[in-house]
């Protein structure tokens, strides 16, 4: 029994090996990955941004070692292991790298929503009361979507400036869960 315990590597050893095998995160790498950010990522807010990050720029480059503290570890451009509490540094770098593309996608999405909204408002057809109520309900939903997407745009900019709005906390929670190093 004691021999089995000795032969089995500890969780700490396995984690260290995994962390040492991470690929480095460079500014160039993050900047190059923005092309993979899609309108679908944007539409899903923090969950979408986290999915993008975990599948593209942070894949094989970041691990979360403590989900409750949201403590991330990654290698910098010099190969040094960086411990990032609350993943604040990497989140800021990531949102700075996608800032322009994200803004373009949000504007595109908002314009699509505005076109839909205008099509409801310019309908020359006579409607029943029920149809009018449906259009009003859909119009309200579209207005809410436009408002929330511009809030998301503002919060994304704030994150790239180092602030921590609601979107930041939701994003980091998703990243921590998705990159947790479990054995």
What are these regions (language model features)?
Residues 2-183:
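Extended amphipathic coiled-coil helices
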